[in-house]
C-alpha cells in the first residue's frame, strides 16, 4: 500500500483502490501539485471546511468519481457531483475496500452552510488505516483501539483548531497503532508544530512515527 501526503490533511492512499482524503491543493501555500495532477477512485471528506473540501468538486467532476461524506455535506454537494452519504457508525463497501465513519470532535460547514457532523474514517484496504480528521483526542478512541485495531493512524498535531503534539501523544497512547503519520500542521502560522517532537515521544510508546515530505511516496 502506498501513501502520499499532499500536505495539510490531504492524503492519497493507493491500495486495492486509490482513496483521496480531504483534497486541499489549490489554496494550500505548501502544495507542490495542482488539483488536475491528482488521480483517485473515490474522495473522502472528513468535513466541509475549505482546507479539507476545497478541491473536492473539481477533482470529482474531472475524474467522474464519487465523494463520500456526512449526509448533510453530501446534500450540499450532490447537485455538482456523485455522492455517497454516511454518518458515524456507518460502513460503506466500495468495491474491494470498507470505509467506516467514526466520530471526530470539531465543526463542519461548507460555503457558510451547516454540513453535518465532522467525521474520521477507518478504511480496511491492504492494511487498516484511520484518518482522524480534525479532532481532539476523545474516549471513543479506546473503542477504536480495542475493536477496530487500525495499524496506521493519521493524526492532526497543529493545535489551535485540533490536537497539538502533546494531545496527539495521548491519542497515540490510547490507539496504540504500529505507525503514526502527523498531519494538519505548518500550513499556516497558527498551526505551526514540530513533528519531530511527536516522533521522539511516540518512540517511548513503541510507535513508529513517519514524517513524510510533501508528495513523498511511502510504501507500507
Curated annotation (Swiss-Prot):
Metal-binding is among the record's keywords: no
InterPro entries: EF_Hand_1_Ca_BS, Metallo-B-lactamas, RibonucZ/Hydroxyglut_hydro, UPF0173, UPF0173_UPF0282_UlaG_hydrolase
SUPFAM superfamilies linked: Metallo-hydrolase/oxidoreductase
A Pfam family the protein falls into: Lactamase_B_3
Keyword Hydrolase found: yes
UniProt superkingdom: Archaea
Keyword annotations from UniProtKB, A to Z: Hydrolase
Extent of the signal sequence: none
GO MF term list: hydrolase activity
NCBIfam families reported in the protein's UniProt record: PRK00685.1
Record family assignment: Belongs to the UPF0173 family.
PANTHER family per record: UPF0173 METAL-DEPENDENT HYDROLASE MJ1163, UPF0173 METAL-DEPENDENT HYDROLASE MJ1163-RELATED
Stated name of the protein: UPF0173 metal-dependent hydrolase PTO1118
Organism listed in the record: Picrophilus torridus (strain ATCC 700027 / DSM 9790 / JCM 10055 / NBRC 100828 / KAW 2/3)
